[in-house]
């Protein structure tokens, strides 16, 4: 039952967040739910509507995390890595919502684009999940070098995934622009997405 599933997510996100580890786990849970929803939704529009709700419900985690001064002693990269997971989700929610109203894409193409965003979110969420043992130490023992190496690796992966999400967006918007240009309808594309030079 999809509606019940979303309700469960909302309840989870009402927890009182008392430590950074819970913030990170909340963000990971939110993105994982977005990925799961987009895999089970019947089409691109329903996918976007469901995942947008989940993203908005989880937004409080990102806002609270931005206010945390010391997530891990001496490692701003951990905080930046987690926040990039939110950035990637936002890139999908904001841009794909516009693509859904773009007549230059077919339904099949929109489904394929959604699948591409899904893959990027899934991989980036897995990377962040690896940081949990650093943020909330468990029985897993890591020396300083191992921790630093893990943080640097995950940070590098997240920078890559964020760039990939932006590149993927630009690539798809450029397809729309070229199709519109053939019909002399470029202005409609600019009106929909804006004239940000990074897209064109």
Question: What are the residue ranges of the model-derived segments?
Answer:
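Single conserved hydrophobic/aromatic residue that forms the stacking wall/gate
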Residues: 1-10
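Start-of-domain marker
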Residues: 12-74
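Alpha-helical heptad-repeat coiled-coil segments that mediate oligomerization/polymerization in large
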Residues: 30, 40, 106, 172, ...
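Perimembrane helix-loop junctions in membrane proteins
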Residues: 36, 64, 137-140, 174-181
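Residues on one face of amphipathic alpha-helical coiled coils
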Residues: 36, 43, 50, 57, ...
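Long, charged all-alpha helical bundle/coiled-coil segments in cytosolic proteins
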Residues: 47-120
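Extended amphipathic alpha-helical interaction segments
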Residues: 88-168
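A cross-kingdom marker for long, charged
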Residues: 174-200
């Amino acid at each position: 039952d999809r509606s019940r599933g979303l309700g469960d997510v909302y309840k989870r996100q009402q927890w009182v967040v008392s430590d950074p580890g819970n913030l990170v786990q909340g963000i990971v849970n939110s993105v994982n739910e977005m990925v799961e929803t987009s895999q089970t939704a019947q089409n691109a529009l329903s996918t976007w509507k469901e995942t947008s709700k989940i993203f908005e419900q989880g937004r409080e985690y990102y806002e609270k995390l931005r206010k945390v001064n010391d997530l891990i002693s001496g490692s701003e990269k951990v905080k930046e890595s987690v926040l990039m997971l939110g950035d990637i989700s936002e890139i999908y929610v904001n841009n794909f919502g516009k693509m859904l109203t773009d007549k230059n894409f077919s339904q099949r193409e929109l489904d394929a684009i959604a699948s591409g965003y899904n893959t990027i979110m899934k991989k980036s969420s897995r990377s962040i999940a690896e940081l949990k043992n650093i943020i909330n130490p468990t029985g897993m023992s890591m020396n300083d070098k191992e921790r630093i190496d893990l943080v640097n690796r995950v940070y590098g992966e997240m920078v890559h995934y964020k760039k990939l999400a932006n590149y993927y967006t630009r690539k798809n918007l450029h397809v729309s622009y070229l199709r519109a240009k053939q019909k002399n309808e470029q202005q409609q594309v600019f009106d929909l997405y804006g004239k940000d030079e990074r897209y064109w």
